[in-house]
Regions:
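A short, amphipathic beta-strand motif
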Residues: 36-42
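Aromatic-rich carbohydrate-binding modules that target alpha-glucans
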Residues: 1, 45-93, 101-123, 161, ...
Length: 800
């Protein structure tokens, strides 16, 4: 019969069944009697090592004797079944209870309900009567877990090659488990190779949502190079790279690709004849073959922009057969890429199995976008809108919004086939993870879509969204002046305010007179992309300041036209901070504010709810992984509706409360179904945040930590421990802290330069992702004082 998604749905995730409670469904051995009564019940509350049984008044059910429990079989996750031979029953009325027990049956936990009763029908020989009963009545223990978040590339061991790899990941899993932590959260591990330069270090710009980045290969897990000289040279290079404080992306990847090619030449033919390789190829060939062809053509043509390739500008399905046949010349071109992905898949699956054996949940990350020049777009372009760019509106991370450059998704096409691309993506991820974070879950409600001619995110609009007609705009009391409100607002006083003594230079070089009051940008600089190209080779700070001023001129509008219907409009995000808004009369400002607040916070709520419910249920149900979401930023009211309905864990940061009426969140108010953290990869670490704004820190110190006097600077280790302990005791199911924040508790271990621990600066789209732990994990694990400190904090918080 129909069951709604239960409140305890998380207990059915592989995170809990496979990693925490270690449940393995058993084969049901049917009772051999001629008349069978089958009892079926769900019992997700059972803990690791507990089993379910049934006791009852009938002789066949033990006559309430705890030594005569009828054991039940877990035939699927959290669902138990018992078959009773009806010929042994004393009557047709059954009275019973379910009991939880461990191996010693004298340690019983009885159901807290009244006795269950069932009245059996008349049964004929050979019949089976099945009863699917209400969930077992045991108290639901809200299990709370602690964990660490760290990118794989940031891991460091004595065996690393200048970057973290899947061997280092196993070492980190061991360390996490040794401190009583149960979760290890990673950043995306997908291949991002576009230019073979450091700009490929951005882990969210994947070229394939299926392929793994070759930089994560554990070279020590591969066969040894037979050539002694090559082996010695490789070890020398590895040691040099590993001595670096930060990742040298280009040197590391050149070294790893070269090493993998040597191993491929030495071992590839033999390894690719194994049954293990053949099974891998069969499982993955749908995406693997085009990925390998794409990678070969990218390197052959010297560019990832397939529109510039002399041929193969679109994936040709007719070539699949030849590319998959070892006897063809085409196969030889791509075999290396098959081999590398086989190696990476095997190593990552080994790390996954190692984590499960250690009771650690590996939590992955689903990037919201893909690179517009990547394999996914090349292979299945129908799923992507290439006439826009995905990003995010302005927030605490970036005053101009974020422009990720990714194409937006063509959900019309994706929904036509039931989101098969997404299902394949999630199912592939389940090979390696038991939980995942949906990056920018708001994008499944509506994405911030920016014109391709924009650099900043300010000229974007939510897509889809209910745009406004002229009549609707005027219904708020604002007389709609289309030309004035949709063109950049450039006047003499604006130029003087922005450019000061350089205002005349700007007028002469970059502007044309539009009318008596206003100017317009010259055609050669009338978009931000044109301005960007004009200043492409400029490094002088004064000229870059001028460039940024030109960007700001172009985005100074009150409304933007809808991307699909230019006769309707969207209010420009953060327009209240610009000169066009300043120029309005007070009554027009008030009218615009009413319109603005209604549009962004009320008008689209039901519409966006419906959009999300078309997509997210399909994705959430594609696998048994535990689903968490990054729901920060401009969050409409409909987001918690959907997340609650689908039982998705929210993200809670005390420094970014979801309640706009408070400056800091109250940890005690975190919902159970949430992930609590202090900092993310887009934020300063705890130590950086502490010194970033002295006034804010002082308020936090007095009002949240309840301490008197001036806050100490820099953040002392004992106070970092206090802050972490408070987060650990929050109601959140998961408390996952960055490795940098864990290290902040120990002044002898932590990196002296707190600024060097920053992973990403979202305001900089060209940021170099190169943070490495400054300590070897082996040395960290050997520091008994640090391990004991972390273990005790976690244990005392009730997380286990």
């Amino acid at each position: 019969h129909w069951k709604a998604m239960p409140e305890d749905a998380y207990l059915y995730s592989s995170a809990f069944t496979d990693c925490i409670n270690h449940q393995a469904p058993q084969e049901m051995k049917p009772e051999t009697g001629s008349k069978i009564v089958r009892l079926i019940v769900r019992a997700p509350q059972l803990r690791d090592g507990e089993r379910l049984g049934v006791l009852g008044a009938d002789k066949a059910l033990g006559v309430w004797d705890v030594q005569k429990i009828l054991p039940m079989t877990q035939h699927t996750y959290n669902e138990w079944v018992a078959d009773i031979d009806a010929t042994h029953l004393e009557g047709r009325h059954l009275e019973f209870k379910f009991v939880a027990f461990r191996n010693a049956k004298n340690e019983l936990l009885w159901e807290t309900s009244m006795n269950r009763t069932v009245d059996l029908p008349e049964m004929k020989a050979g019949e089976l009567v099945s009863y699917e009963l209400d969930q077992a009545f045991f108290a639901l223990y809200n299990r709370k877990l602690a964990g660490t978040q760290v990118p794989v590339f940031s891991l460091r061991t004595r065996k690393s090659a200048g970057i973290g790899d899947f061997g280092d990941l196993k070492t980190m899993i061991d360390f996490v488990a040794s401190t009583g932590q149960k979760v290890l959260q990673l950043l995306p591990i997908n291949d991002t190779t576009i230019t073979h330069t450091w700009t490929d270090s951005y882990p969210y710009s994947c070229i394939s949502v299926f392929a793994i980045h070759p930089q994560y290969a554990d070279l020590h897990a591969l066969p040894e190079l037979k050539d002694a000289k090559a082996r010695a040279e490789a070890e020398k290079t590895r040691a040099e790279l590993n001595a670096l404080d930060k990742i040298d992306y280009e040197k590391v990847n050149d070294f790893k690709i070269n090493y993998l090619r040597q191993i491929f030449n030495q071992e590839g033919e033999k390894m690719m004849k194994t049954a293990e390789y053949k099974a891998f190829f069969q499982d993955t060939e749908l995406w693997l073959v085009p990925y390998a062809q794409y990678s070969y053509l990218r390197d052959k043509n010297g560019t990832a922009d397939f529109n510039q390739w002399p041929d193969h500008q679109v994936w040709d399905e007719a070539e699949r057969k030849a590319l998959a046949d070892p006897k063809t010349a085409a196969y030889k071109n791509v075999a290396f890429f098959y081999f590398v992905q086989f190696v990476l898949d095997r190593q990552m699956q080994e790390a996954h199995e190692h984590a499960k054996a250690k009771g650690v949940i590996l939590k992955g990350d689903i990037p919201i976008g893909v690179n517009r020049n990547g394999c996914d777009v090349w292979t299945e372009p129908k799923y992507f809108n290439l006439n826009g760019q995905a990003g995010a509106p302005p927030d605490d991370f970036s005053a101009n919004g974020q422009n990720w450059g990714f194409p937006t998704y063509n959900w019309f096409e994706m929904l036509k086939d039931g989101c098969q691309w997404w299902n394949r993506r999630f199912q592939n991820m389940a090979r390696y993870f038991d939980a995942y974070r949906i990056d920018h879950v708001l994008g499944f409600f509506r994405i911030w879509e920016i014109p391709v001619h924009s650099v900043h995110g300010l000229l974007g609009q939510f897509a889809p969204a209910l745009a406004m007609s002229r009549e609707e705009i005027e219904s708020y009391g604002l007389h709609f002046q289309e030309d004035r409100f949709t063109r950049p607002f450039i006047t003499d006083w604006v130029l003087d305010r922005m450019f000061h003594e350089r205002a005349g230079e700007v007028k002469e070089k970059y502007l044309d007179r539009l009318d008596d009051e206003r100017y317009q940008m010259k055609p050669e600089v009338d978009t931000q992309r044109k301005v960007e190209a004009l200043f492409a080779d400029v490094t002088d700070e004064k000229e870059l300041w001028l460039r940024d001023g030109l960007y700001a001129l172009i985005s100074d509008v009150l409304f933007v036209r809808d991307h699909t219907n230019p006769s309707v409009f969207h209010p420009r995000i953060s327009a209240q901070l610009d000169f066009i808004y300043e120029s309005l009369y007070d009554n027009d400002k008030a009218a615009f504010n009413r319109l603005y607040n209604d549009y962004f916070y009320r008008r689209n709520n039901q519409f966006w709810y419906q959009e999300a419910m078309k997509k997210l249920p399909k994705l959430v149900q594609a696998t048994r992984m535990l689903v968490c979401a990054e729901d920060l930023g401009m969050v409409p009211d409909c987001v918690p509706w959907v997340m609650d309905e689908l039982k998705i864990l929210s993200l809670e940061l005390q420094s970014m409360p979801k309640d706009p009426s408070v400056k800091f969140g109250h940890l005690s108010r975190n919902p159970y179904r949430s992930v609590c953290t202090i900092s993310s990869r887009d934020m300063p670490t705890l130590r950086m945040w502490w010194d970033e704004n002295i006034q804010r820190t002082q308020e936090y110190y007095n009002t949240m930590l309840y301490r008197q006097g001036p806050a100490p600077h820099p953040l002392p280790g004992w106070l970092a421990s206090d802050i972490i302990s408070r987060h650990l005791t929050s109601p959140s199911m998961l408390c996952i802290l960055s490795i940098q924040d864990w290290l902040a508790t120990d002044e002898a271990l932590r990196l002296p330069d707190a600024d060097a621990e920053r992973i990403n600066i979202p305001a900089n789209p060209k940021h170099y992702w190169r943070y490495r732990m400054h300590l070897n994990i082996e040395d960290l694990a050997a520091d008994k004082r640090f391990v004991q400190n972390i273990t005790e904090m976690i244990s005392q918080s009730g997380r286990c």
